[in-house]
Amino acid sequence: MSKKPVLNLDTSNGFSEEYISHPERNDNQGIVEITDLVFSSESKLTQRKESRDSKTFVPSFLEELDDDHLHELVTNGGILYMNSLGEGVSGSVRKCRIRGTQMIFAMKTVLAAPNTALQKQLLRELKINRSCTSPYIVKYYGACYNNAECQLNIAMEYCGAGSLDAIYKRVRSQGGRTGERPLGKIAFGVLSGLSYLHDRKIIHRDIKPSNILLTSKGQVKLCDFGVSGELVNSLAGTFTGTSYYMAPERISGGSYTISSDIWSLGLTLMEVALNRFPFPPEGSPPPMPIELLSYIINMPPPLLPQEPGIKWSKSFQHFLCVCLDKDKTRRPGPQKMLTHPWVKAFERIHVDMEEFLRQVWSD
């Protein structure tokens, strides 16, 4: 199997060597490292008018959708369901197109027992998501219930490069490693999204690789935020379990704060860097779920090790240590973390995320 190439970063950018990692060339490692930032805006969707003989509402653009219009499209067969984007315990996500148009979006379908009070509560929480307008937040277009199928449908922005979870597992399957430069851009994007949410008094609550999406141009976006997991479980009549990305204070039953999202970000970045979940140490026998939660609470936080052919910068290692501080009072919020030297460096360093993603998904 061919290995992913290593592209060297032009270090004539004025930043100290302390802030940049320079993985040594090692064909056996197959490290993925790309340069030059390209953050192009997403191409605007072509506006289309409703057909005269159509009785179903057809929007001119996706932002024109609302809950009622989405319900009409779902009920009257106005949506073409394309390929699956992901499956979970309580639902799925599919790529969709509005019939008669080229408008593409993602539809999340969640199991939903017929409980009117819970349905109304969840729709209220989802309206908060719709009000968010940030390049680092996935756009939400509308939500509706299909009581005949016991489903909640949520229409949202389609991100062509997929989730960080899918991206790093694709790199791993090809014998590669995701390098520090793409991780730096991802960290900046996630922190920018969290900072935006924090300004609006919203805590994400579920930062993990599958909830960090990237467009084909490399724009980082957060999804699935601000909605109570307990509410979703109650509505679906299921229990999806405790997320292993939860901060220790949350696993222990303590309150959730914005710094809890920072722990989850640190764990996510370390997982992608290592190509595996950081707990327990490599070589340990697979733990039972309750054992893993106990390990996260009671054992020291993981450290990012240096490996043959891979040199992580001291600044990146320090960033992860700050994120994974078990004392939540010492763990900063997203605005403070945006000032960390490692993140500040990657705010300006050019990393061609579009090319990185093209290589990841090329055959």
Swiss-Prot record:
SUPFAM superfamilies in the cross-refs: Protein kinase-like (PK-like)
Keyword 4Fe-4S: no
Activity regulation behaviour: Activated by mkh1.
Annotated PROSITE patterns: PROTEIN_KINASE_ATP, PROTEIN_KINASE_DOM, PROTEIN_KINASE_ST
Alphabetical keyword list: ATP-binding, Kinase, Nucleotide-binding, Phosphoprotein, Serine/threonine-protein kinase, Transferase, Tyrosine-protein kinase
PTM-bearing positions, type Phosphoserine: 234
Catalytic activity: L-seryl-[protein] + ATP = O-phospho-L-seryl-[protein] + ADP + H(+); L-threonyl-[protein] + ATP = O-phospho-L-threonyl-[protein] + ADP + H(+); L-tyrosyl-[protein] + ATP = O-phospho-L-tyrosyl-[protein] + ADP + H(+)
Enzyme class per UniProt: transferase
EC number(s) stated in the UniProt entry for this protein: 2.7.12.2
Domain annotation Protein kinase: ranges: 79-343
Cellular component, GO, one term: nucleus
Modified positions (Phosphothreonine) in chain numbering: 238
GO molecular function: ATP binding; MAP kinase kinase activity; protein serine kinase activity; protein serine/threonine kinase activity; protein tyrosine kinase activity
Keyword Phosphoprotein: yes
Enzyme active site: 206 (proton acceptor)
Highest rank taxon of the organism: Eukaryota
Binding locations of ATP: 85-93, 108
One BP annotation, GO: cell integrity MAPK cascade
PANTHER family noted in UniProt: DUAL SPECIFICITY MITOGEN-ACTIVATED PROTEIN KINASE KINASE DSOR1-LIKE PROTEIN, MITOGEN-ACTIVATED PROTEIN KINASE KINAE MKK2
Family: Belongs to the protein kinase superfamily. STE Ser/Thr protein kinase family. MAP kinase kinase subfamily.
Function, as annotated: Involved in the mkh1 signal transduction pathway that plays a role in cell wall integrity. Activates spm1/pmk1 via phosphorylation.
The protein's name: MAP kinase kinase skh1/pek1
Annotated organism of origin: Schizosaccharomyces pombe (strain 972 / ATCC 24843) (Fission yeast)
